[in-house]
From Swiss-Prot:
SUPFAM superfamilies: FKBP-like, Triger factor/SurA peptide-binding domain-like, Trigger factor ribosome-binding domain. Gene3D superfamilies: 3.10.50.40, Trigger factor ribosome-binding domain, Trigger factor, C-terminal domain. It comes from Pseudomonas fluorescens (strain ATCC BAA-477 / NRRL B-23932 / Pf-5). GO terms for molecular function: peptidyl-prolyl cis-trans isomerase activity; protein folding chaperone; ribosome binding. It is an enzyme of class 5 (isomerase). This is Trigger factor. It catalyses: [protein]-peptidylproline (omega=180) = [protein]-peptidylproline (omega=0).
Length: 436
């Protein structure tokens, strides 16, 4: 077999391959012999059909199959011989397919970029530390109470945080617009559910009152047909209900699966959950900084095949998340290209760090992570057992741990500054990073 390789770009390779005709004919004859053993042709006993008849009937199909198999096998033999690492399936262009002649074809494909991860010392990381103070715990208890608020009808004017039951009709240019009217809608004043001015315009209203609100849709309103348009809303208030926060009782604690523990037991459980959330938030922020630093220090070209695969995967995820009748390939690729590129580049960089430093998942850390995740459930032992009985789930945890070990490896070489902050600042969500 003869092989020659041309570098047509940084990552694209054009490989010309010539396979001896004898190899093709050997595969064709093998298939014809197999066919002869089972072919049923009128006038002949099974297995006794002359090869000339078999060739006449089946050689074309046998040759097509043989050529396909030989191309596939010879391609992978060639990339191994040339020490190439394809990043996707090749595009194959046959050149010579004539019977009795050597098979010649050209395979065009991309390879994975070859690089060494560098620039660790240029990565700056701010590592936060924080504690769950009693005031943080008190705030969380108040949040939990508000999340379980009940509303009772009140015979008074509406205030912020009250829940109103309303009917409304919205018009633009004197015409009711699609989605602009509803009956029996529950609206909490101050929730920000409606456009600016709507909820504010109902403060002070009483049950049975009708108000007309003249408002303007925001410029960035999701419905572009309504963006920046003046609108008139006629609103009828059916009822006004005031919020009633639940007391910190055993009944309230039971809603969170905590029974017969009392207030102190409930506080201890909430604190434990907050501390777990705090650890995860700090770890996530450190990881994001490390990944951003690796990206900035290691610009690499991305194989288009990998980028396309990741875009398609994100399309499928989006359809699964948001539903609807849309098909994944109907979503514009441009929506996902930045995120896809970031993921692909980071995947390549992380894999190279693992290779450079010969990292393997630390099984002790794997068990610790599983136990920490399991602690959020009522039967943690069962959760731990479930992970160790499911190899796929266990391998996913191993991948997470291996990525954590990559972060630790980078931190040993990066410029790290420790900073003490409040619990609130430490758990504040990080803005989604943008691809470079």
């Amino acid at each position: 077999m003869q092989v020659s390789v041309e570098n047509t770009s940084a990552l694209e390779r054009r490989m010309s391959i010539t396979v001896p005709a004898e190899r093709i004919e050997s595969q064709v004859n093998k298939r014809l012999q197999q066919t002869a053993q089972k072919a049923k042709i009128p006038g002949f006993r099974p297995g006794k059909v002359p090869m000339s008849v078999i060739r006449q009937r089946y050689e074309a199909d046998a040759r097509q199959e043989a050529v396909g198999d030989v191309i596939q096998a010879s391609f992978y033999e060639a990339v191994v011989e040339q020490k190439l690492n394809p990043a996707g399936a090749p595009s194959v262009e046959p050149k010579v397919l004539e019977k009795g002649k050597d098979l010649e074809y050209v395979a065009t494909f991309e390879v994975f970029p070859e690089f060494t991860v560098a620039g660790f010392e240029n990565i700056a990381v701010e590592r936060l530390s924080a504690d769950v103070a009693d005031a943080d715990l008190d705030n969380m208890l108040e949040i939990l109470r508000k999340q379980n608020v009940r509303f009772e009808v009140a015979d008074r004017a509406a205030q912020n945080d009250d829940q109103l039951n309303i009917d409304f009709v919205g018009k633009v240019d004197g015409e009711v617009f699609a989605g602009g009217s509803a009956k029996g809608t529950q609206l909490v004043l101050g929730s920000g559910r409606m456009i600016p001015g709507f909820e504010e315009g109902l403060v002070g209203a009483k049950a049975g009152e009708e108000r007309v609100l003249n408002l303007t849709f925001p410029e960035n309103y999701q419905n572009l047909d309504l963006a920046n348009k003046a609108a008139e809303f006629t609103v009828t208030v059916n009822s006004v209900s005031e919020p009633k926060l639940p007391e910190l009782t055993e009944e309230f604690f039971a809603q969170f699966g905590i029974k017969e523990a009392g207030l102190e037991g409930f506080r201890a459980e909430v604190r434990k959950n907050m501390e777990r959330e705090l650890r995860q938030a700090i770890k996530s922020k450190v990881k994001n900084q490390v990944m951003d630093g690796l990206l900035a220090s290691n610009p690499i070209e991305v194989p288009k095949a990998l980028l396309d695969n990741e875009v398609n995967r994100l399309r499928v995820q989006a359809v699964q998340q948001f539903g609807g009748n849309i098909k994944p390939d109907q979503l514009p690729a441009e929506l996902f290209e930045e995120q896809a590129k970031r993921r692909v580049v980071l995947g390549l960089i992380v894999a190279e760090v693992v290779k450079q430093f010969d990292l393997k998942p630390d099984e002790d850390r794997v068990r610790e992570l599983i136990q920490e995740m399991a602690s959020a459930y009522q039967e943690p032992e069962q959760v731990v057992s479930w992970y160790y009985k499911n190899e796929q789930q266990l391998n996913e945890v191993r991948s997470v741990v291996l990525e954590e070990q990559v972060v630790d490896t980078v931190l040993q070489k990066a410029s790290v500054t420790d900073k003490s902050v409040s619990y609130e600042e430490a758990v504040k969500p990080v803005e989604a990073p943008q691809a470079d």
